[in-house]
Amino acid sequence: MLIVARALVEGRHRIVQPIDIVGHTLLHHEGAPTAWRQWAAQHGVPEVQTVAGPRFAQYSALIQAALNGLGIGLVPKLLVQEELAEGALLSPCGTPVRVDQGHYLCYRPDRLDLPAFAAFREWIMDEGQKSRGVETEA
């Protein structure tokens, strides 16, 4: 989901449609290196510079940078629901974009024989299924 601080887009820097992000600083998450390129392609904005801009290892740091007006970020909506509800962040252009990344649980097959691990695996898989009902796209 595209996020931006209200102060950054007031006045002549408004973001109403996807093309309006051209010229703004894009904030990148190191774990989602193609997110901006995918967003631009899915929104028909090929002229946006999707490589330049600061990079963050943690979504929390990227979100804080957006809150401080340092640029526009792409983050899972799940991580900014409170900031959006409070109006601290805006999500102009609405439409989220699915990115081609996921989470994986890697383990040795013999670990399923351990009750504690089997319970953890079941729990984490259930949590993943529940989050499918929550908008987690970037």
What does each model-found stretch correspond to?
Residues 1-70, 75-100, 126-138:
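C-terminal regulatory
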Residues 3-6, 103-113:
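A bilobed periplasmic-binding-protein/Venus flytrap-type ligand-binding module shared by bacterial periplasmic
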Residues 33, 114-117:
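Short, structured helix-loop boundary elements
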Residues 55, 77, 108-111, 121:
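Basic side chains
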Residues 105, 116-129:
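Bilobed periplasmic-binding protein/Venus flytrap-like ligand-binding cleft at the lobe interface
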